[in-house]
Amino acid sequence: MTSEILRNEECNPNLLKKKGLELLDAGKTNEAVECFSKGLVYAPFDSLMRFWRGRKLIGREEYTQSASDLKLAALENPEDWECWYYLGVACYLGGMYEEAKVAHANSKTLMKKYGVNALPATTDWYWMICMKLGQPEEAAKALEDITPDMPTEDGDYLCRVLLYKGVLKPENFVEECEKNCKKQSRC
């Protein structure tokens, strides 16, 4: 449907955004990225198109371009924890550790503010960043508010953080992670 309308309104950024989201739903990531890119020609400050293009560029290992898009999306929408989270991921994977650290600190603050059950995920990335930067004390401090029974959307991140914290041991990590995950109904 959107494709038919776009033939008549090929410069309409809202239709290009809608088409890009439809393409993502259909698993056509490359086509979606191109659609968002075209939409950004007509609406360069559309934070949603920037976010989705930036997020999907991570999967293409285009970390610098991804970080560029996600940074602008985060600045346009500073209360969106996901923009900061994926900016941190892109920066980490692109070797921009200081920027990644700031992004994950912002993500964590916003997750707490809005009650998002994803603290272990951003804490995991933050811990890895601190370790890369040679800041083990700060990495350890980041783990303080993570507990085995905390609600989370992704039990794998929680298990990794509990491993860093010493709650789970490397010798039986997989078994303990599965047990913890089932106990919390997160698998």
What are these regions (language model features)?
Residues 2, 36, 63, 70-71, ...:
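Hydrophobic/aromatic packing residues within the alpha-helices of TPR/SEL1-like helical repeat arrays
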Residues 21, 55, 89, 128-131:
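Residue-level recognition of tetratricopeptide repeat
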Residues 5, 38-39, 72-73, 106-107, ...:
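Canonical positions in the second alpha-helix
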Residues 8, 42, 76, 110-114, ...:
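Structural marker of alpha-solenoid helical repeat scaffolds
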